[in-house]
Amino acid sequence: MTVLGYPRSWSCHCLPVLILLLGIGHGPWVEGVTHYKPGDPVILYVNKVGPYHNPQETYHYYQLPVCCPEKIRHKSLSLGEVLDGDRMAESLYEIRFRENVEKRILCHMQLSSAQVEQLRQAIEELYYFEFVVDDLPIRGFVGYMEESGFLPHSHKIGLWTHLDFHLEFHGDRIIFANVSVRDVKPHSLDGLRSDELLGLTHTYSVRWSETSVEHRSDRRRGDDGGFFPRTLEIHWLSIINSMVLVFLLVGFVAVILMRVLRNDLARYNLDEETSSGGSSDDFDQGDNGWKIIHTDVFRFPPYRGLLCAVLGVGAQFLALGTGIIVMALLGMFNVHRHGAINSAAILLYALTCCISGYVSSHFYRQIGGERWVWNIILTSSLFSVPFFLTWSVVNSVHWANGSTQALPATTILLLLTVWLLVGFPLTVIGGIFGKNNASPFDAPCRTKNIAREIPPQPWYKSTVIHMTVGGFLPFSAISVELYYIFATVWGREQYTLYGILFFVFAILLSVGACISIALTYFQLSGEDYRWWWRSVLSVGSTGLFIFLYSVFYYARRSNMSGAVQTVEFFGYSLLTGYVFFLMLGTISFFSSLKFIRYIYVNLKMD
């Protein structure tokens, strides 16, 4: 019995995956090791095909007219593998451990003109295939295309009908797997009449060799045999240059701001001592700057429930991002494992929902919020609802085009169950703890009942200018690394420099905090006490710059095309920018709050 075309064993696999997501059992990043004896069968699974320049546009391998068993048996997949678009199925290839095969016939085929045209179109779009041997992905192109720009113009398309598998072993374990088409001529697909059948004979060979490498992670050539480009190792100099510029920027802002602030505190405290005989109101009338608004600076903002929800979800994603990077640094992710990061991200997201509930409810109660149930609902839906809407559009496009990236109904129900049984309850539990542990808001100054009138502000202190400056500077700190991240997620790179990623992430947060403090100081100096939302928007606008960069990357740095890839790219890029807005907006707000409390605590007042 099958479910949506996949075996029931896959549906039964959902229960252990759910248990896995609850933190029971081994994580998805644990690398399995299979031990073989000479002559033992080694199963080769066919997985997916798709355009080389559209990594997220993938289809089942057997959707092409290729050698296929009479009954297709699918491999049970983990949740992360399903989310990665994997659809592994058994193949006709017969491989035995340490037994070479010179040339063996896989199958004979008679292709119709429609099937030939399907293959021609796939080859013209640079379709690649992915097989999996002992959890090692091996990739190659479906065919060969040669086009001449000289006269006479030629356009030749050929299909690779022979594959040469090269496998390396150490002891009783497989270390490396690769496929090539060396010394093989492609079978021409040109010149076929519409009523003519094309006869093909698919063959393959297997070569085994022993290696001294004991672990797959030590195999520097990687799991793809150079099929995907590797250029990540060359960006050290750019990263170091970026770090130097960022440290100079942070140091400059910190030194200048501290000097100005120290002078302000000394002047204000001196003026306070000389006018100690008068009232505070009399003193305010003779002063200007950030001190004069001390009775309004802690006035609670409008839409406080939404503000607290932003802070809660932002804190959750800060914990989630830190957790993913730390797990990568500890070696829990392996390039050979399918969907490991996907599974870990879902697990961490579900578990960190308690953080969003706690932070949001705790601060909401501190600033006088009364509708804490509504606050919890808003917090739990602030990211999940935009994510669901984005995913619905993307998944519908994949489903309409028959892509393997479209999630089956069982997986959708599993993810919904995880959110309903783990994520949302943890948000509520965190909210209850946050509400009960909240103390009154600690404001160094009392707030008057009547709000002070805010004087007209110059154009360079407007929200738009603050968002431009506050968003561009943190973005410039990560722009170099952002290219490599995009090349990994939306291209064919493999990211392994997690140490650099950790430092860049720390630099991003540090720059965001420093810029937020500087912009908040300039805003308060203009007697504008509406800093609550401004601090979130100023540095949170980095997410907008990241989305604009994604548009630039799509247009100038990639060869992506087609509705499937385009919808997925812009949908999830917009969601990524939103996540960065939440994270950096949270860092910016709490940095500004800490700074404001510091300067007003150190200010002598009646």
Swiss-Prot record:
GO BP annotation list: autophagy
Protein family membership: Belongs to the nonaspanin (TM9SF) (TC 9.A.2) family.
Free-text function comment from the UniProt entry: Plays an essential role in autophagy.
Glycosylation site list: N178, N401, N559
Endpoints of the signal sequence: 1-27
Residues passing through the membrane, by range: 237-257, 310-330, 339-359, 373-393, 412-432, 469-489, 499-519, 535-555, 570-590
GO CC entries: autophagosome membrane; cytoplasmic vesicle; lysosomal membrane
InterPro entries referenced in this protein's UniProt entry, alphabetically: EMP70
PANTHER family on file: TRANSMEMBRANE 9 SUPERFAMILY MEMBER 1, TRANSMEMBRANE 9 SUPERFAMILY PROTEIN
Membrane topology: Multi-pass membrane protein
Pfam families according to UniProt: EMP70 (PF02990)
Lineage: Eukaryota, Metazoa, Chordata, Craniata, Vertebrata
Places the protein is found: Lysosome membrane; Cytoplasmic vesicle, Autophagosome membrane
The protein's name: Transmembrane 9 superfamily member 1
UniProt entry keywords in alphabetical sequence: Autophagy, Cytoplasmic vesicle, Glycoprotein, Lysosome, Membrane, Signal, Transmembrane, Transmembrane helix
